[in-house]
Amino acid sequence: MNRRIFSSFIFLLLVGWAFAVSVTPAGNLPEYYAAVNNQSGKNLFDKVHTVAKVGYHSLGYDGLWSAYKQTDVRPDGTIWDMYSNCHFKLGSKQCGNYGSECDCYNREHSIPKSWFGKTTSGPGCDIFHLVPTDGKVNGMRSNYAFGEVSSASYTSGNGSKLGSSKTISVNGKTVAGDNISATCSGKVFEPIDEYKGDFARGYFGTMIRWAGDHQAFTSGNGGSIFSGNYTATGNFGLTKYGVALLLKWHREDPVSEKEIARNNGIQKTQGNRNPFIDYPYLVEYIWGEKAGEKVNLSNLISSSDSRFHPGESNGWIGDATDVEEVTFEPIVPTAVKVLRDGQLLIIQGEKVYNAQGCLINN
């Protein structure tokens, strides 16, 4: 073979291999996440961080508009806005000025950019937390932290609220301690229940992707949710309130078909994936009930697995010791009486008895 042709052949093989690694199909997720198996604590956090970066390339802030056409479209073909009931046509009514709901939509930093230096590069254009939302509602949300509202001062058309914070409680073990409760001081913004898990996993995924790149997200109101300390003693980047809130939302609103489709769309545009949409139960190994334990991927199912039921499954299947033993009672066949050649017989299943109850055929 000609040396130049051979070199070109090898180059194409390497390019194809690199492309296959960075654009792993959703059906091959166990292999994609193999590096996190048997990891725990800080090692697990770091491995997930590494996987979350695979294939990433910046869309740029302006590139988000066109990316939304592949990531945030409702079945009716309009923009999927999680803050309002507005249905914006693709490519039209991009903000712009607004005075009321449904005037236009913009690019919402669900992790406000004022929390990390007001940049529109790096995390400032990461589509996993930048979602299309109504301009008016986005403006009302401002840079307030997420939370649950006890008394609303503003409510959007779809029920998203701004107001004073409730106390958030989580029972059981977490990385922040057992049976934790915390409150955010000042106003908080609360999306509707249908999307709380989406935002929680967006926070988990965005934070862990940028954690090793000097992004703390702790400026201003960000300090109520993010600790900036990516060790176990720092709750792996979250405050006690952040752990309580995001765990609660993650558990109460499981991964939906919408999120799965968005995750796949983001890989096609931005190149990377959100580990906590692919394997939702990984959250428990870092911040929740399995904190400190080693991951066993054979106990988990991904959101692409046929056994995973969107909107219901948490991604845990456990092992044989978790399977409840079931005892089956034998089913006794019904006995029938028949008259055969002038003789009364009793037939039960395949057994035949005479009138005196003696087995005459087995």
Provide a role label for each language-model segment.
Residues 1-3:
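N-terminal secretory signal peptides that target proteins for export/translocation
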Residues 21-88, 285, 292-295, 302-305, ...:
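N-terminal module-boundary/linker segments of secreted carbohydrate-active enzymes
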Residues 97-106, 111-318:
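Domain-level detector of nuclease and nuclease-like folds
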Residues 5-14:
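Sec-dependent N-terminal signal peptides
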Residues 317-362:
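C-terminal outer-membrane/trafficking sorting elements
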